[in-house]
Amino acid sequence: MKKIGNGIKDKLSVIILSYALDDDIYNLNKQAIESLLASETWPSGRLQILLIESNKENPYQYPYPNVDVLIPNEKFGFHRFFNIGIEHTDGEYIAFCNNDIIFHKGWFSAIREVADNRQRFLCFSPIDDSGNYPKMTPEALPRDKAYYRGWEHQKHFAPWCFVWKREVFDITGPFDETVDFYGADCDEQNMMSRNALWSVVCTKSVVNHLAGQTAIVKQSGKGDKYRITDYDKYPLTEFEKTHNYPLWIYDDYRFYEGYQKLKKKWGLDNTNKWLQRKITQYPILNFRPLTRLLFTKRMNHIFCRLRGIKP
């Protein structure tokens, strides 16, 4: 990916991934778009919506302002389509979104307020206030603070909707297209932590996730089609079974393969999360030359040995 710079100032580009196989998914897309349009009073030219459709025979139209539908010739890849979206948009801010979400009033203004007051922050997430995510409840994230920083999954980082400034990709490079839907969120967390980019969750910004309603999730873990039954073929160490991976990955071998691919790239996920917590606890450690050294597979193996864990 070429150097992409900062984009048009104050403009938000929203990239929504869709696989509209039926009217249910189409209506889900419409609900997301309509809630987005109603969530703010958008100044002219300051909102761009790009829906990237995987159904190459897509029969659906979206009669809304600022909405473009792109049907790539390429085979679907979660990160591949996000990279295509980056190339086809021009906003200073880019929101990477599932289609099973509902935007609440003022969600982007709340992110902008934090971004304007803390210009060193480049990566943001809204909260989900439905109660479905325990780490985002008022008890876990008291609302008396406008933001919290860290990299914890479904706490500081909401993979269903996250907003990064365009300049992030001049620091990190593009999304890794060898990483697909299965495990992409862990790869994105490591992208941020390796490059000393805090993931900042904004407590006044609300985007609720209607979990499990996308086409790709509906087809995952159903019946025996993807379920792992040969455990010798898909082994986990005892440590991984108890500390590293949720055992529901056995419901779908594609999740297993995705996490194993990340293990080859980043090392043991549990140790990376341990390191992310340490840096969150001691933020003086969060500077780029150090984090780029720490978040490597070689250092991951060293930390594993120091922790008494077999990598």
Residue ranges and their predicted role:
Residues 102-139:
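Conserved donor NDP-sugar-binding/catalytic core segment of glycosyltransferases
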Residues 94:
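Short aromatic/hydrophobic "clamp" motif used to bind/position activated sugar donors
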Residues 190-311:
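Active-site-adjacent helix/loop segment of glycosyltransferases
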Residues 145-164:
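A recurrent flexible, glycine/aromatic-enriched loop bordering the glycosyltransferase active site
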